[in-house]
């Protein structure tokens, strides 16, 4: 294998041509295919050997690109930099190619290229380690990044939200604080869209001074400017976003207290109502949000309220909520609809933030939902029917309300 690598390696800079580079790219393509095959068979030793060869090839290609700036004229049109040779030149064969080529580069080329993603083969459950784009590099297009992220199939609802959120206009940045505080129950999905938006646009990437997913989280703080191994997009969301996030959790608690006063729920039951709604939005999605935010206070607020309700001893409700979590297909469909519809918010945002009528209407709907939950608590025999009914009504309400 070392001999094959040496033979593919040009002897001098003068001999480096497009054919030579293409040959090495083909070799890398073959290596990636072999790595994927061995991973599917569970042969980790062979995977490691091929990954080392692939790593050396990529390092060599990066060295060529750095040492000879004129090499861009010799390279194929799409991959003008070595990093683009990974996702741009080999993206057709599967997600692991991009992940392997990017992951190997992340060790040796942190200063020159935008490395992204730890090798997914080594971390099969680690799609959250998504590209950390450095501030100096803008060669990696957002479409390529969207490809890299959307191929992470093991993050529920994740591949759905990334493409849709890329279309969100930039104007959300200014009004995100007001929108988050007024969106009430809409907030959990909306910050995800915001973080995706920040991650997928260079404008927001430059704004994320101290962070990086949403996803890290995808996210999607996807592109971390400090090339740290923060998982998913915004392991630490940007400064102005962080207070609004904390404010949103306080807003939720305030809403819960408001619900408890309206409907005579105890604080535990009102908290349980809100986690149930979030769970409908998808613990699959929201668990991803938690890891993307990496914000202990917000995470803990959500988890504590949920656990507090579980500890309340309502076993039937806990089972029902577990059923929702297990119905990942329904969750993802609902989350996808919610996120895709939220693309309409940015255009309506400036009119929506001052529009107390719309917010009041939505709050009123949530109060009605609270009544349904209250009736569910009192008549446990029809829990399944009443549990499903507000959920189905939420989908219809979201479709009409957001469009």
From Swiss-Prot:
Disulfide-bond pairs as recorded: none
GO molecular-function terms, A-Z: transcription coactivator activity
Gene Ontology, cellular component aspect: nucleoplasm; nucleus
Region annotation Disordered: where it falls in the sequence: 72-111, 152-171, 224-303, 318-403
Compositional bias annotation for Polar residues: 92-105, 161-171, 263-277
Keyword terms, alphabetized: Activator, Calcium, Chromatin regulator, Nucleus, Repeat, Transcription, Transcription regulation
GO biological process entries: chromatin organization; positive regulation of dendrite morphogenesis; positive regulation of transcription by RNA polymerase II
InterPro entries: SS18_N (IPR007726)
Annotated region described as Necessary for nuclear localization, given as residue ranges: 341-403
Motif (SH2-binding): 50-53, 360-363, 398-401
Region feature Methionine-rich intra-molecular domain, mapped onto this chain: 149-238
Chain intervals for the UniProt region annotation (N-terminal auto-inhibitory domain): 1-148
Domain notes: The MFD (multi-functional domain) domain is involved in transcription transactivation, nuclear body targeting and dimerization.
Quaternary assembly: Homodimer.
Role noted for this protein: Transcriptional activator which may be required for calcium-dependent dendritic growth and branching in cortical neurons.
Name of the featured protein: Calcium-responsive transactivator
């Amino acid at each position: 294998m070392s001999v094959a690598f040496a033979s593919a390696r040009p002897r001098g800079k003068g001999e480096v041509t497009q054919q030579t580079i293409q040959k090495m790219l083909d070799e890398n393509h073959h290596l990636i295919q072999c790595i994927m095959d061995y991973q599917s068979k569970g042969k980790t030793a062979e995977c490691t050997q091929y990954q080392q060869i692939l790593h050396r090839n990529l390092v060599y290609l990066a060295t060529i690109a750095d040492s000879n700036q004129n090499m861009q004229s010799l390279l194929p049109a799409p991959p003008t930099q070595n990093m683009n040779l990974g996702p741009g030149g080999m993206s057709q064969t599967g997600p692991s190619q991009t992940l392997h080529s990017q992951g190997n580069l992340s060790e040796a080329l942190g200063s020159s290229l935008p490395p992204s993603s730890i090798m997914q083969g080594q971390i099969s459950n680690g799609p959250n380690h998504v590209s950390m784009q450095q501030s100096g590099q803008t060669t990696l297009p957002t479409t390529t990044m969207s490809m890299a992220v959307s191929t992470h199939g093991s993050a529920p609802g994740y591949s759905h939200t990334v493409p849709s959120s890329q279309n969100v206009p930039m104007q959300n940045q200014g009004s995100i604080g007001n929108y988050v505080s007024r969106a009430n129950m809409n907030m959990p999905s909306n910050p995800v869209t915001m973080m995706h938006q920040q991650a997928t646009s260079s404008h927001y990437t430059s704004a994320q001074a101290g962070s990086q997913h949403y996803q890290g989280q995808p996210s999607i703080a996807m592109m971390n400017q400090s090339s740290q191994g923060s998982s998913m997009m915004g392991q630490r969301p940007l400064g102005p976003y962080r207070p609004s996030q904390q404010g949103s959790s306080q807003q939720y608690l305030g809403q819960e207290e408001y619900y408890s006063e309206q409907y005579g729920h105890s604080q535990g039951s009102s908290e349980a109502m809100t986690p149930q709604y979030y769970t409908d939005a998808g613990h699959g999605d929201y668990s991803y949000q938690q890891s993307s935010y990496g914000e202990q206070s917000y995470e803990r607020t959500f988890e504590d309220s949920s656990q507090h309700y579980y500890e309340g001893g309502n076993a039937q409700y806990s089972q029902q909520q577990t059923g929702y979590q297990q119905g990942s297909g329904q969750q993802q469909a609902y989350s996808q609809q919610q996120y895709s519809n939220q693309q309409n918010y940015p255009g309506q945002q400036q009119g929506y933030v001052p529009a107390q009528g719309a917010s009041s209407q939505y709050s009123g709907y949530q109060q009605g939902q609270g009544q349904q939950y209250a009736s569910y608590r009192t008549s446990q025999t029809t829990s399944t029917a009443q549990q499903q009914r507000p959920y189905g009504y939420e989908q219809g309400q979201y479709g009409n309300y957001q469009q």
